[in-house]
Design a protein with these regions (language model features):
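Bacterial N-terminal signal peptides that target proteins for export
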Residues: 2-10
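C-terminal motif of bacterial Sec signal peptides marking the signal peptidase cleavage site
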Residues: 19-22
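Active-site region of glycoside hydrolase catalytic domains
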Residues: 28-73, 122-124, 133-346, 355-460
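Active-site mouth loops of central-metabolism enzymes
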Residues: 81-94
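Catalytic domains of carbohydrate-active enzymes, especially glycoside hydrolases
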Residues: 91-116
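Glycine-rich, proline-tolerant flexible connector loops at the mouths of alpha/beta enzymes
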Residues: 115-127
Length: 461
């Protein structure tokens, strides 16, 4: 029972955190030549979460095993209820032209997607040419629409045959074979590479699904670091100008303290410390933080729909990373706001308001010398959030369970994002709609001093 409880606490604590000195801000001439854009405005998806037609994988097996069955701590650490059937997700596999067109209409110039290892390599050593052609066409469609592809190579899903051989932890060599082939295939196309999505959360998901035990967490992160370095080597061998990162989901010290005491090792510091020598840019994800009036103890998974939002803390997190890892450009790979099945939040904050406030504070960060080069909104469309369609993050909302047509319905944030990408930020004179938290503790007490909303702002373009 102790082991099971520790597993639930570990997965819940990490996943709860996820749902919920100035320098020259201008890049040098050499840096400008190395990057295709002055600023990357993006939106994001992930293969398994949106594609449909799911091939055999660790996650398909988990969902097939648990969907629709009575809730247990192992099957529902997120507090979202029974595992939903996967069905066809939102069918990006057949509707990517529509989704890319919607992204293009908002003016975004970057599109994050995943290439699913399980889809393109369904058996050891066998490549599925039809599925590779599908990804070729997705990238060609992005290029026709003037977008930079950001490709994630591991977003927690791997082939069933890898699961049969001991899971990701024991098959980094096979992952390197996959990564080498994909980075070579798309070399020279201006791709921004993300090796492994949110390594800490990846470990939590492996615990959740029974692939690893809590006492294997530190060793698992070591293997993920090995995998990241393999991607870095492969991408740079194929293209010396390649740009590679891994995206860390920022978790506040207050939240980490809740489960460090469980005996789990490897989470005390940043994952970037393990791979600092193999990063071309630093990607992080931020959703919400902690404060004296928003303590971690109140941020349970069951309350996440109404957890206080702290848009201003994206500034503190960006500053923290710029100070810890000077010299690396910083990209917000994921940021967004969750709602409960699309219902209005109890605080009445809208997706548009949270987006505007977040961008406002990124403009402030840039003006204060923090080298922000890009921002992705998570997500373009509602998707399958690891066992549930209940959490909604999409700029376009989709009723995956109730609407056979999977209609994309724009939220209020679509028009807002179009204005932001056009103008390089919020409208002149905009001031944040959300009240700042009282004494933020998101990056420790150094973020307690409130930011002045009347400070300088930079255009992000």
């Amino acid at each position: 029972m102790v082991l099971k409880w520790n597993r639930v606490l570990l997965a819940s604590a990490i996943l709860a955190a996820l749902s919920v000195t100035a320098c020259d801000a201008q890049p040098s001439a050499t840096q400008k030549a190395a990057w295709d854009r002055n600023f990357y405005w993006g939106t994001a998806t992930a293969g398994y979460q949106v594609e449909g037609d799911a091939p055999d994988s660790n996650w398909r097996r988990y969902v097939d095993r648990t969907a629709g069955k009575p809730v247990t701590p192992d099957s529902d650490p997120l507090g979202a209820g029974p595992v939903d059937p996967y069905k066809q997700a939102v069918d990006f596999r057949h509707r990517y032209h529509e989704d890319i067109a919607n992204a293009h209409a908002m003016g975004v110039n970057t599109f994050r997607l995943g290439i699913e290892w399980a889809r393109v390599m369904p058996e050891p050593g066998r490549w599925d040419e039809r599925e590779l052609a599908y990804y070729d066409d997705v990238l060609a469609t992005l290029r026709k629409n003037g977008m930079t592809p950001m490709i994630t190579l591991m977003h927690w899903v791997y082939p069933g045959w890898i699961a049969d051989r001991g899971g990701f932890m024991n098959n980094v060599g096979a992952f390197e074979e996959f990564a080498t082939a994909i980075t070579k295939r798309y070399a020279g196309q201006g791709v921004l590479w993300v090796s492994i999505n949110e390594p800490l959360a990846f470990g939590a998901m492996e615990v959740r699904t029974g692939a690893i035990k809590p006492d294997q967490f530190d060793a698992f992160l070591d293997r993920v670091a090995d995998a990241h370095r393999a991607v870095y080597r492969a991408a740079h061998a194929a293209d010396p100008d390649a740009k590679v990162t891994t995206n860390e989901a920022y978790i506040s010290p207050e939240v980490l303290a809740q489960f460090v005491g469980l005996g789990v090792k490897g989470i005390e510091g940043s994952f970037f410390d393990r791979v600092e020598d193999s990063l071309d840019y630093l990607g992080f994800d931020y959703y919400t933080g902690t404060a004296e009036d928003n303590p971690a103890s109140a941020q349970s998974m069951t309350a996440r729909w109404n957890t206080k939002l702290q848009a201003e803390d994206i500034y503190h997190v960006a500053r923290h990373y710029s100070q810890q890892y000077p010299g690396l450009p910083i990209y917000v790979v994921e940021n967004g706001m969750v709602t409960d099945n699309g219902k209005p939040r109890s605080d009445r904050v809208t997706r548009s308001q949270y987006l505007e406030d977040t961008v406002f504070w990124l403009q402030r960060a840039k003006a204060d010398g923090i080298p922000i080069i890009g921002y992705n909104y998570w997500s373009l469309v509602d998707n399958y959030e690891w066992g549930s369609y209940r959490p909604r993050f999409g700029l376009y909302t989709v009723d995956a369970l109730g609407d056979p047509g999977l209609k994309r319905v724009p939220t209020d944030a679509v028009a807002t994002y179009a204005q932001i990408t056009r103008d390089g930020g919020t409208v002149p004179g905009y001031r944040p709609a959300l009240p700042a938290a009282h004494c933020s503790t998101t990056v420790g007490k150094d973020s307690c001093e409130p930011l002045d909303p009347n400070g300088p702002l930079a255009e992000l373009k």
